[in-house]
Amino acid sequence: MKKKNQKLQDIIGIACGVLLLVIMAVCIISSNTTKTVGDTNVSAEAQTLTGTAQGRNGPVEVEVVADAERIYQISVLNHEETEGLGTVAVEKLPPAIYENQSLAVDAIAGATITSEAIKEAVIAALESGGLDPSVFQNEVAAAAPVDKTDVELECDVVVVGAGGAGLTASVFATQQGQQVILLEKMPFVGGNSLRAEGGMNAADTKVEAELGITDSTVDNFVEDTLRLGHNRADPALVRTMAENSAEAVDWLFSIDAPLTKVVATGGTQHKYLHKPENGEPVGEYLVEKLKVQAEQLGIDVRVNTKATEILMEDGQAVGVKAEDDEHNYIIHAKSVVLTTGGFGANFELMASYDPSLANAVTTNHSGATGDGIAMAQAVGADTVDMDQIQLHPTVIQQDGTLVSESVRSHGAVIVNTEGKRFVNDLAGRDVVSQAELKQPDGYCFIIFDQHLYDEVELTHKFVERGFTITGETYEELAQNMGLQGDAVQNFVDTMNTWNESVAKYKADGTPDAEWGRDNGMDDDLSTAPFYAIKIAPGIHHTMGGIKINSNAEVIDTAGNVIPGLFAAGETTGGIHGGNRVGGNAVCDFIVFGRIAGKSAATFADNVALPNAA
């Protein structure tokens, strides 16, 4: 009888497991499809067609119902685009194409690659049925001017910019009991934080202690950050970031955003970089967790809403003016937090500091134009380090896709077209970038193996998007990379030498003999197949911005605090100096986002709404 019962329990368990898998599969499919938009009545000549094009993260497949003269229906069947970024284009572009009967509609701001992929997939679908896509390229009429409605709103804290810093500040201020309005000019939240791939640096954390890492102290973190920033950063801000980093990691655990893996990052002497357990890109991971918190806390998040001016009264920030397509807003607030990001997509502004950057590739999203900096300057705020603009050494030039330090932290190396390493691959970003710019042909390759691919999830998208070159042997990979003559054997020798260096390092801590590398050497690159990605430097981070103090209070040009005005994240300057350390941007926006949220909440607790009777 016991055996029968056990057998029955086993069958039920298996059935439940299968049912769970089916439900999960349905959920996964559902999350990557969109509802069909268009007519329910179609012509007798209409065909149901499918087409595919490459998006940012993978293939985008669409289904189109059309005849020679009209598109009746469009739906996106499958995609792998980033939630809250590419998915905005997936949601909004098919209706726009249908309503205008045109593929000449504007791309969705900040999601250009996904937008173009949807258009190309529709073209492929039409062509597969023998239909002429040029019929659907008619010019789209400009939208008629709208008489905007004037609206006044009130809140305790208004936060401008819904990237990582803005979301963090909003959540933290709300946790302190404040009513928050969060504004975002783009059609999605997350900003550049969605593009952060590596991790968050932090010192003296519980995670490090559990992993037996004892030398990643606050003092070492401060020293590494100042040294790699060429001692231009404000030591007080750097120490504030380091001293508050462990508590910030604890807070992330408390909001169901644990970072449980720790590795080294470029140029540092110790392991500080905290990552999600499965190796997924840290930015998407944290933004999604912060969005959930914002929703659960009932924060008033308004996308497609651009702040245009800080309202001042008797020298104090008392709100902002903002606008969307239909409204002009005056938002009265007890305190204002600026978290609008840097200006890495404002080529005119960057070129005013460095003309060589006018035509450079950028890893930044299109909304990173420095709006908050300009608004702050308009009310007397000072700025710092505006001419310090960072190049990242491993950028795919086709579209500005970043290959994070995390890949090198797990053992990848960089070689030139002669098949040789030419720098400590994990030196500071500026050092590696400048070394690359001196190499023949103007580009290099980052190399990794199957073991690293299996360990680091973010490498999968490079394969899926067709950015990788592969080979079953070092020689085959070199040939597929287009290396010529002696460069092929040079590459084979380089890889063998590297693997020997890793073995020595693991045995007794001996640094890499060629270039002195002494971190990111836990595993060699010996597991076939082997991968290469063609890369070169690209604009990545603007270190300069609004001047703040350790309370995230904005400082004016006379050196005084502007009451009621706070700032955090890449819109500020003084934290990274002349070169930002990989992993410090995330630390910056979480730590100073929390500080700005707390400071704004404390200020709000002690003042009345300016327009209150």
Residue positions per predicted region:
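Helical element adjacent to the flavin cofactor pocket in flavoenzyme catalytic cores
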Residues: 278-334, 373, 377-379
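Active-site- and interface-proximal helix/loop "cap" or "latch" segments in soluble metabolic
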Residues: 37-141
